[in-house]
């Protein structure tokens, strides 16, 4: 890649360069950063943490809608919702395509992203990762009941993803890296840090093989969050 994965270097600022608003640690912000990295797009990250005690800045352009991160701005176009942003990044910029050409394959990628957002993200990140790996930072014990309740939910979501993962790989949809890989990787980077999450992934051979390869990609290494340390 000839352009930086994270922010613009001095002298690279351009009115055409996109701006990404959000906290670097956020799963959905990372999915967008991964898409930008894989496309080789230079961008500027403006740190916005809507979960901070003081909340988002009053002048945050998107705070009057759903107070969401990430948000994205490019050539006057303003977007929010990570899956909309990653699709825009794929179509608006040069670089390797992150969506298949065929309608069935494209539908499969969209299906995987939908499963991640609707069934996997909340139990894996908020119930498993936050409780097991971050509760102590807040000075409290992990909520074991919450963790136990999340495990069957995660198992069901990962079972569906295991069935949809291409048997020959190396990526979820086959030989080509797609947005499905990026959205799932952003979530598993946290979820797999909890022993319960790691065990659930390891028990599914296709996903486990995929994750071991995906986590080594330069884009993953260059977008690591301090929370992964």
Where are these regions (language model features)?
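A generic structural-conservation signal
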Residues: 45, 223-224
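Short capping/connector residues at structural and topological boundaries
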Residues: 103-104, 176-177, 225
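Carbohydrate-binding/catalytic loop surfaces
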Residues: 228-229
């Amino acid at each position: 890649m000839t352009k930086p994965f994270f922010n613009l270097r001095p002298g690279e600022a351009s009115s055409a360069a996109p701006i990404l608003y959000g906290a670097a640690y956020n799963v959905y912000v990372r999915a967008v950063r991964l898409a930008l990295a894989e496309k080789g797009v230079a961008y500027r990250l403006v740190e916005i943490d809507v979960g901070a005690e003081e909340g988002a800045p009053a002048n945050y352009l998107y705070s009057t809608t759903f107070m969401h991160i990430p948000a994205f701005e490019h050539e006057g176009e303003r977007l929010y919702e990570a899956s909309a942003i990653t699709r825009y990044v794929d179509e608006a910029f040069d670089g390797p395509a992150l969506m298949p050409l065929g309608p069935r394959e494209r539908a499969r990628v969209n299906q995987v992203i939908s499963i991640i957002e609707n069934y996997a993200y909340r139990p894996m990140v908020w119930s498993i990762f936050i409780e097991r790996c971050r509760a102590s930072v807040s000075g409290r014990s992990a909520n074991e009941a919450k963790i136990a309740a999340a495990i069957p939910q995660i198992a069901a979501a990962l079972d569906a993803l295991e069935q949809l993962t291409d048997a020959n790989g190396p990526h979820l949809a086959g030989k080509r890296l797609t947005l499905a890989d990026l959205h799932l990787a952003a979530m598993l980077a946290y979820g797999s840090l909890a022993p319960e999450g790691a065990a659930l992934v390891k028990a599914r051979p296709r996903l486990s093989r995929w994750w071991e390869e995906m986590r080594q990609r330069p884009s993953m290494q260059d977008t690591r969050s301090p929370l992964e340390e």
